């Protein structure tokens, strides 16, 4: 028996639509997981916009945290550089995956021009908070 709380969802690459989001130099492809899970989860692909070239300085608010209970990042292409409070600085490349504990303070510093990643979060709708 299926769970009535969740809906079956398929998101085809050939029908993908990328939209603007949190970062001005990135575009985001919603994979439909938030709607299918009634907001419990969010899964999206994020990538550098075609008009952005070379290493990108991330235009963040500095250190921040997402008010989530789950956050996972899987790099599909290129690389990205993060600083995690209490953990250090990391460069993640194609095929690398990171699970970040809930509400960990972090900052994205730079990425390659071909950077693309899958990010999965819970809950689907959440706040991002600037921290010192």
Predicted segments, located by residue:
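Flexible, glycine-rich phosphate/dinucleotide-binding loops
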Residues: 37, 81, 126-127
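Short, conserved beta-strand element in jelly-roll/cupin
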Residues: 45-49, 65-82, 120-123
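Short acidic-glycine-tyrosine-enriched beta hairpin
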Residues: 86-102
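A generic structural motif
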Residues: 83-85, 109
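A short glycine-rich, His/Asp/Glu-containing loop-to-beta-strand
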Residues: 17-64, 69
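Double-stranded beta-helix
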Residues: 2-14, 19, 107-132
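Short acidic (Asp/Glu) patches
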Residues: 57-59, 101-104
């Amino acid at each position: 028996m299926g769970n009535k709380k969740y809906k079956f969802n398929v998101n085809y690459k050939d029908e993908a639509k990328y939209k603007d989001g949190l970062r001005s130099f990135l575009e985001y492809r919603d994979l439909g997981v938030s709607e299918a899970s009634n907001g419990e989860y969010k899964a999206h692909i994020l990538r550098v916009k075609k008009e952005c070239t070379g290493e990108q300085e991330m235009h963040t608010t500095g250190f921040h945290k997402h008010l989530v209970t789950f956050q996972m990042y899987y790099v599909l292409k290129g690389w990205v550089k993060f600083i995690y409070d209490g953990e250090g600085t990391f460069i993640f490349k194609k095929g690398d995956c990171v699970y970040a504990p809930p509400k960990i303070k972090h900052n994205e510093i730079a990425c390659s021009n071909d950077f693309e990643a899958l990010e999965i979060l819970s809950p689907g709708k959440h706040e991002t908070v600037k921290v010192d």
